[in-house]
């Protein structure tokens, strides 16, 4: 099953945390849709900034939105004007008090979502899919990735029949739950139709902290 399931979802609660941290009773559906709306709005508005992840925390009538961005300068704007405008728009959308936090993505080459979006953009610019995949894999491995797999699916190179091609380097142990594997998906809208891009990046193992045995008095 490791081959089929989303590696992020499989590892939630084991080595990965939730991206939406809140509890709800009867208004769960309402808040979930609000989360989806906020994420879609932020991703669309900050397309140039490279936003792989938006974390949302809620407490009473307050919402904390943490935006992970490869180019935080674009999100913040000159003198913080852009981030302030964004906060006001989110407050108008949710009707709640919103705090916006910007987190910089230090190595965009090791973020699967950003890598997938980068490959999709190259495909839209008519770059050969093999070249796009190969160069991206090399860049990720140079930045310290332990393994990467990229899969492109659709009418590759304008072929009549759709197919799936993939390229990988290093190792990507999908069944190992302690393996820190990032997964990203993006779509390239080409003149021949959509091409789906999936990326798996293995960053190493996350080992649990050793428990120190407590010694009781005199023993």
From Swiss-Prot:
Disulfide bonds: none
Protein origin, superkingdom: Bacteria
GO cellular component terms, A-Z: cytosolic small ribosomal subunit
A single GO molecular function term of this UniProt record: rRNA binding
SUPFAM superfamilies in the cross-refs: Prokaryotic type KH domain (KH-domain type II), Ribosomal protein S3 C-terminal domain
Keywords from the named record: Ribonucleoprotein, Ribosomal protein, RNA-binding, rRNA-binding
Residues of the KH type-2 domain: 38-106
A single GO BP: translation
Annotated InterPro entries: KH_dom, KH_dom-like_a/b, KH_dom_type_2, KH_sf_prok-type, Ribosomal_S3_C_sf, Ribosomal_uS3_bac-typ, Ribosomal_uS3_C, Ribosomal_uS3_CS
Pfam families documented for this protein: KH_2, Ribosomal_S3_C
Regions annotated as coiled coil: none
PANTHER family linked: 30S/40S RIBOSOMAL PROTEIN S3, SMALL RIBOSOMAL SUBUNIT PROTEIN US3C
Record's function text: Binds the lower part of the 30S subunit head. Binds mRNA in the 70S ribosome, positioning it for translation.
Subunit relationships: Part of the 30S ribosomal subunit. Forms a tight complex with proteins S10 and S14.
Family recorded in the similarity comment: Belongs to the universal ribosomal protein uS3 family.
Protein name as it appears in the record: Small ribosomal subunit protein uS3
């Amino acid at each position: 099953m490791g081959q089929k399931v989303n590696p992020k979802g499989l590892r939630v609660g084991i080595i990965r945390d939730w991206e939406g941290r809140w509890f709800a009773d009867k208004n769960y559906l309402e808040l979930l849709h609000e989360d989806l709306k906020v994420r879609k709005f932020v991703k669309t508005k900050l397309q140039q900034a490279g936003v792989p992840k938006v974390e949302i925390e809620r407490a009473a009538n307050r919402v904390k939105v943490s935006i992970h961005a490869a180019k935080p300068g674009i999100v913040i704007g000159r003198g913080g004007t852009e981030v302030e405008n964004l906060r006001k728009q989110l407050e108008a959308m949710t009707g709640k008090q919103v705090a916006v936090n910007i987190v910089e993505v230090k190595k965009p080459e090791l973020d699967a979502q950003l890598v997938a979006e980068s490959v999709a953009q190259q495909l839209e610019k008519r770059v050969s899919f093999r070249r796009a995949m190969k160069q991206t894999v090399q860049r990720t491995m140079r930045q310290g990735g332990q393994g990467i797999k990229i899969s492109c699916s659709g009418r590759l190179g304008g072929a009549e029949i759709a197919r799936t091609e993939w390229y990988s380097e290093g190792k990507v142990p999908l069944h190992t739950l302690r393996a820190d594997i990032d997964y990203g998906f993006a779509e390239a809208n080409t003149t021949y139709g959509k091409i789906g891009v999936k990326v798996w990046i293995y960053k190493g193992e996350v080992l649990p902290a050793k428990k120190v045995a407590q010694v009781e008095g005199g023993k």
